[in-house]
A protein has these predicted regions:
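Cytosolic, long alpha-helical scaffolding segments
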Residues: 1-168
Length: 168
């Protein structure tokens, strides 16, 4: 515990733990590709294995989320508003939650994808995973954005990445 009262005004940057969380959420979402490939192949043992891996990853993401919330500084001078960080954390959490839910529903119902739709479905899943990967890249750029004081070339880079994410 810092003894200097001025030190306690400034919070430790929460960006690192947020980056760990989105990385785990993306890892869970990326599991949708092998999951859908196994569904198309009707390899239900593999479908179940991938789904269980996704459940484990989502639970790890939830533990990271809880840790971020518990240790998010309540100090006066955070680099960004606490409410914005909590909102971002909530959005990140939905990435893993939705991926896990999709896998659970499809496995539970043993859903099959009609052959004429299989290629389009894989392309759709790939685009969804690409969007998750772009979100991961954006959050990973936050350190540099903070270091530059939200100015200069780094701001333009992050803005273009966010715009690309909006298009996906």
């Amino acid at each position: 515990m810092p003894t200097n009262p001025f030190i306690s005004l400034f919070g430790r940057s929460p960006i690192g733990p947020m980056q760990q969380h989105i990385a785990k959420a993306h890892e869970c979402a990326a599991g949708l590709l092998p999951f859908f490939r196994a569904v198309i192949a009707e390899d239900w043992a593999q479908v179940e294995q991938v789904q269980q891996d996704m459940v484990r990853l989502e639970q790890e993401a939830d533990r990271l989320k809880k840790n971020v919330r518990m240790h998010l500084p309540k100090s006066l001078f955070l680099p960004v508003p606490r409410s914005d960080l909590l909102e971002l954390l909530s959005v990140q959490d939905k990435v893993a939650n939705r991926a896990k839910d999709i896998a659970g529903l499809m496995l539970g119902r043993r859903m099959r994808i009609p052959p004429p739709l299989q290629g389009q479905m894989l392309a759709y899943v790939q685009r969804s995973v690409d969007a998750s990967a772009q979100a991961l890249r954006v959050v990973n750029e936050l350190n540099e954005l903070l270091e530059t004081g939200f100015g200069g070339r780094e701001t333009s880079l992050v803005e273009s990445m966010v715009e690309e994410l909006d298009r996906e």
